């Protein structure tokens, strides 16, 4: 019995020690990274959007962040892509929709609501809970082709330029599954989308590699069952649907887990086919789960399942009074929250995640390792 008690006691202590060590390593590894990249190009959805949605929609966005337009973000501050740019000594990425901008140091093609699959897929499958405009992955790649013409003039020059650029391709897929859930698809039916979504992502990465890209970061999905909008829209009276430790909805996280597992397998295969490149899988899921399990250890005193900015309710998310709309309020301590508006994150977790992608352990391999190995070669 005594041995059993020691084991039970040691598990949370060990977890706490691991978190403390990780935080110390991240804070201690603040030396500047090599100024290796000449540009960064980002694709994805609202977790990376730095203004495209605002520009496309004539500046009409309920949740207006604290950045001046056209660099509006769905957060109270910087995103992962911003911290990556800063780490490599590059300016924050301008949105590609801001025509006339100099994109010689990078561009951001990400748009809130973007999907991995084209609009036609959803219409063909009677999924109509989608944005009225098409900003899918393939559309963003078309925008990249347009921007490319302003950066370089011939294929050889372009390949040389992109070989020294960093590409961040995603997160994609979260919106695809979200729209299917809204169409009342079953768990089993939503999971049937995953192979198509992953195959689309791999084709997109291959297209960038064919353009000359050598370093591509591909983020996985976040745990949708931890996000306040999911917890609010799909409550269950069956307590077994919830994780007893954290309170997240297990079925929605299971789709993200399946997506991420299939994506990693597909990226490993792609890496073997394209040994001249480094394809990095970047993990959103694991750090978010850690925030949900032990938020206080990361400084999130208000937890991971309740939004900072919202219109009330158990998770401070209300569709009729979402962040920025009448009836919503904003907390005084955003850094004590993981969730900003019930969908997106506050700046603090984005900073933490970016550091783990740069230094490890939540990127495979870490970007700092990729750069230093490439410089040696």
Specify the residue positions occupied by each region the protein language model found:
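Conserved active-site regions of diverse hydrolases
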Residues: 2-377
